[in-house]
């Protein structure tokens, strides 16, 4: 079953402390990691900046991305890959995700209070 992962992040002070050259080197490393993940069937659907004008917009983070992968195992490998890049050293980060379910199933769970 396909899994989807939404990442949310903002800069840490450690990111701001890097020189532009260091940031560029890190960005290149992230680009390579994204390519490796794509070859493993993990694909990005895109990256974005949080739209603060959106009704009830998430205020805790500045950026987001969404990923699609074939299984929970692929998701776990993805998260290990993110950690291996050093991403969490430079960004406050939270994840949201799981397999997509039908609206009917999730609404029924709400009715049951689950």
Regions found by a protein language model. Give the residues of each.
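Short amphipathic alpha-helices in soluble, non-transmembrane regions
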Residues: 76-85
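Conserved short beta-strand edge segments in small beta-sheet-based binding/regulatory domains
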Residues: 87-100
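Secondary-structure boundary motif
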Residues: 39, 84-87
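Conserved, mostly hydrophobic/aromatic
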Residues: 65
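Short S/T/G/P-rich N-terminal loop/turn motif that feeds into the first structured element of a domain
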Residues: 1-61, 69-75, 99-114
């Amino acid at each position: 079953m396909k899994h989807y992962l939404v990442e949310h992040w903002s800069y840490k002070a450690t990111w701001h402390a890097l020189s532009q050259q260091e940031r560029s080197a890190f960005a290149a490393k992230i680009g390579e990691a994204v390519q490796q993940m794509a070859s493993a069937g993990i694909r990005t659907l895109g990256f974005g900046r949080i739209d603060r004008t959106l009704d009830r917009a998430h205020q805790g983070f500045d950026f987001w991305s969404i990923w699609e992968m074939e299984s929970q195992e692929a998701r776990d490998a993805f998260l290990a890959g993110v950690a291996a890049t050093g991403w969490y050293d430079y960004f406050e980060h939270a994840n949201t995700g799981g397999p997509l379910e039908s609206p009917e199933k999730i609404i029924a769970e709400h009715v049951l209070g689950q």
